[in-house]
């Protein structure tokens, strides 16, 4: 069991399908560890859905805020209070043609450096066979298997300083480490060799880490 039983920690998850959070919630429920999943704040304004998200104690992410600290404030507070927080650092469903994690944003690194929370990879594979990326249709055919791999904490202690996420070089290095480990863990779960480079959603091609 690689999930801590005490203290706040951050799960970094790859994003294949809109039902990924269901898989995450199921695994964490079986582990008897409550999890706060980060979700874009716009969804909280949707009738019925917003109420359900608040009931589930999801954490709103205000992506329009100009201050990066304000965007992640609720998640940082939850981590400081000893809670488990889950983030999809790609920011959206992967656009990689082969469903590898695409270039991640800096949010996970910022949270880790600002709170000192452990960062643990939560990798899954198979949800895309139940609900394809960008689709709202569920495939109810049997034998749709979802596999989960929980990795070791990503070493970031040497980057944690009093300046936290204000240290831009530390944020960049932490982001690269998280990116690299996520891809390595996906490769291990899929039993495949990872591609060279990472998919950049803007350039629509693979680039160096």
PLM segments and residue spans:
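Catalytic core of membrane glycerolipid acyltransferases/transacylases, capturing the structured
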Residues: 5-65
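Residue-level preference for the first positions of well-ordered beta-strands
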Residues: 8-10, 84-88, 120
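Hydrophobic/aromatic ligand-binding patch that stacks against planar heteroaromatic rings
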Residues: 27, 52, 77, 110-114
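A charged, well-structured terminal subsegment
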Residues: 73-81, 146-172, 178
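Short, highly charged C-terminal tails/helix-capping segments
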Residues: 189-209
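Catalytic-site beta-strand/loop segments enriched in glycine and acidic/polar residues
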Residues: 78-108
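A cross-family acyltransferase "interaction/gating" segment
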Residues: 3, 98-165
């Amino acid at each position: 069991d690689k999930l801590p039983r005490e203290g706040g920690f951050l799960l970094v998850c790859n994003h294949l399908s809109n039902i990924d959070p269901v898989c995450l919630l199921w695994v964490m429920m079986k582990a008897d560890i409550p999890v706060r999943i980060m979700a874009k704040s716009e969804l909280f304004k949707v009738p019925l859905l917003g109420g359900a998200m608040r009931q589930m104690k999801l954490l709103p992410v205000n992506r329009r805020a100009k201050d990066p600290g304000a965007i992640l404030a609720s998640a940082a507070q939850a981590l400081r209070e000893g809670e488990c927080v889950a983030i999809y650092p790609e920011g959206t469903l992967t656009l990689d043609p082969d469903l590898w994690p695409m270039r991640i944003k800096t949010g996970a690194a910022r949270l880790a450096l600002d709170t000192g929370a452990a960062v643990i990879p939560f990798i899954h594979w198979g949800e895309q066979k139940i609900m394809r990326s960008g689709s709202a249709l569920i495939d109810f055919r049997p034998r749709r298997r979802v596999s989960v791999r929980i990795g070791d904490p990503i070493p970031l202690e040497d980057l944690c300083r009093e300046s936290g996420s204000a240290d831009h070089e530390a944020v960049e290095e932490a982001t690269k480490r998280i990116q690299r480990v996520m891809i390595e863990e996906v490769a291990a779960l899929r039993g495949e060799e990872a591609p060279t480079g990472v998919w950049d959603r803007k350039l629509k091609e693979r680039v160096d880490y």
